[in-house]
Amino acid sequence: MGNNFKAPENSHQHNQIRKDTENDFFSGIRLNPDVVETYYIDPVLVTGLEPQSIEAEQFRQLKNNILFPEKGTPPKSIMVTSFSPSDGKSFVAANLAISIAQNIDEYVLLLDCDLRSPSIHSMFGIGDGPGLCEYLSQGIQLPSLLVKTFLDKLTIFPAGKIPPNPAELLSSDRMKRLIKEIRSRYSDRYIIFDTPPPHLTAETNAISRQVDGIVIVIQHGKTRKKDVLNLIDIYGKEKILGVVCNFARKGIGYGYGKYGYGKYGYGQK
């Protein structure tokens, strides 16, 4: 997976975009008519805001590597995680979800399972409402927590309020039942889990056992080779879809074994 990304300018700000805009974001994309006319989108969603950019093209390559594997069937449930909290896992998960949803026939459900430091809701400008935490702790029904996005075929399951016991919630039997339920109920779509680093949280390992494949995000110049190999050993080689490298300088690329590393430049978790 050779992928090139540059750091989006003013990544701390949100773009205000209207449905009648000429911005490339809406070119060839089916919008959700039920969502309000104005969207506040984080500039890090390069696959939507800059669909003709090198960054968006690299995400399309990442998507194609996953959707069209050399062997076997495509993984329908995908966990995106990282070695460290600031390696860019949410950036990769969100842009991968958009890229898949831009396909003609593909639908995507994106879950923010980082209950300690959630960010998916902020990226998509959907507000700070209830989500996974409330489902696990209060028994709120799943359909009422799913949030429609500006893309007709992309749905978000936000993290909700930060709980005092994230490890217990994500390792619970109710979480296991949730994964089984969404895989059964939404078998027609790809399901992407944005999860925290496994060496910091035990709950990520519980989720990894219930997904079809895993994408690991690392940081160039920071994550050590032995740390990556340790993650691969934890999850098992058969589960690893690929490893992507964030923050790399342009023109730098390398790989560990059969797992491809790309060239990213980005500065958010």
Describe the function of each predicted region.
Residues 1-269:
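P-loop NTP-binding module
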